[in-house]
């Protein structure tokens, strides 16, 4: 088996780094929305995981039933978080496979 040229390996590594950085920028520039209760509660989450807005339909605001609202908020947050994880996997996953092409060094 022929060893790959070190300059080739470095060039490939630099390309991978640039692609990873671009994917990270795309993720950070994205906002995902998680909803619960058929849209009664929604949470917008930025690519860095910070919540940027929460929308609550007045129909679910009931002082006698705070638990339902809490459950809806948790559900909307969980959905937004899951969407963000899926986005990161879609953007970064294919790039991690590129390490196989670096001469088997990784």
UniProtKB/Swiss-Prot annotation:
A GO CC annotation given for this chain: cytosol
GO molecular function, one term: DNA binding
Keyword vocabulary terms for this entry: Cytoplasm, DNA-binding
Any Pfam family matching the protein: YbaB_DNA_bd
InterPro entries reported for this sequence: YbaB-like_sf, YbaB/EbfC
Compartments where found: Cytoplasm, Nucleoid
Residue intervals passing through the bilayer: none
Similarity section: Belongs to the YbaB/EbfC family.
Protein role: Binds to DNA and alters its conformation. May be involved in regulation of gene expression, nucleoid organization and DNA protection.
Quaternary state and interactors: Homodimer.
Name of the protein in question: Nucleoid-associated protein DIP0260
Organism lineage string: Bacteria, Bacillati, Actinomycetota, Actinomycetes, Mycobacteriales
């Amino acid at each position: 088996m022929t060893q790959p040229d070190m300059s080739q390996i470095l060039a490939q590594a630099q390309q991978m780094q640039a692609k990873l950085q671009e994917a990270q920028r795309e993720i950070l520039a994205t906002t995902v929305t998680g909803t619960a209760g058929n849209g009664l509660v929604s949470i917008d989450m930025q690519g860095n995981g910070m919540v940027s807005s929460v929308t609550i339909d007045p129909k679910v605001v009931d002082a006698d039933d705070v638990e339902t609202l809490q459950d809806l908020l948790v559900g909307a947050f969980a959905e937004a978080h899951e969407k963000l994880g899926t986005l990161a996997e879609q953007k970064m996953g294919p790039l991690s496979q590129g390490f196989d092409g670096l001469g088997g060094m990784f």
